[in-house]
């Protein structure tokens, strides 16, 4: 794994540098703009899946500021990460707030689709950039509205997915029974705490990556 500072001031971590296609993982945030951190959910997914998919270059993004109030800043970091990924075929994986970030970036030529993991898809979010792409969503049934991130719930992401379907965007919607918000948290010591049903999140993500890897 290598780390790289983006021109925007954000950061990326890259696994499987020689992969011929890319998966760019954009993460969540809070209401108050705070310095970005590495996503525990993204880190666990890459740890589990990078060895299984050597053909995929995994690019994790750390925003300068992680907040839905700084969405434009997060999108700029994501766009810089797509450039750093440097592949003609790229899947965007957006967790929580990252769902909106990924949708905002979907029109990028190299992007073939978006995989939203418990994504934040507010009703005012324009989905036109998804035309000609895919939108697949995975959400835990026990996820609920979180402080600082209005609208993160299975009902919200389902509504966003159905809006995309009405635009002719193909994709699947998968629920994880009793699944929470993502598959991991960060411990006080910096390690990963795996949430219940984390294997289901890994399996659902792997199913989409199978198509990407070809």
PLM region spans:
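Short, surface-exposed "cap/lid" segments of acyl-processing enzymes
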Residues: 3-55
């Amino acid at each position: 794994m290598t780390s790289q500072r983006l021109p925007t001031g954000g950061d990326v971590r890259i696994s499987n540098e020689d992969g011929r296609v890319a998966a760019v993982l954009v993460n969540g945030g809070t209401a108050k703009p705070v310095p970005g951190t590495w996503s525990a959910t993204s880190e666990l997914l890459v740890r589990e899946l990078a060895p299984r998919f050597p053909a995929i270059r995994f690019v994790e993004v750390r925003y300068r500021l992680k907040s839905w109030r700084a969405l434009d800043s997060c999108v700029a970091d994501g766009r810089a990460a797509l450039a750093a990924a440097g592949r003609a075929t790229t899947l965007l994986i957006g967790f929580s707030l990252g769902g909106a970030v990924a949708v905002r970036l979907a029109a990028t030529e190299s992007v073939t689709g978006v995989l939203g993991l418990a994504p934040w898809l507010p009703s005012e979010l324009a989905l036109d950039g998804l035309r000609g792409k895919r939108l697949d969503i995975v959400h835990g049934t026990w996820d609920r509205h979180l402080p600082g991130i209005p609208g993160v719930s299975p009902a919200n992401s389902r509504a966003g997915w159905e809006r995309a379907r009405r635009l002719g965007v193909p994709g699947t919607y998968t629920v994880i029974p009793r699944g929470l918000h993502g598959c991991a948290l960060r411990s006080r010591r910096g390690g990963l705490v795996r949430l219940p049903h984390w294997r289901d999140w890994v399996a659902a993500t792997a199913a989409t990556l199978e198509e990407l890897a070809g």
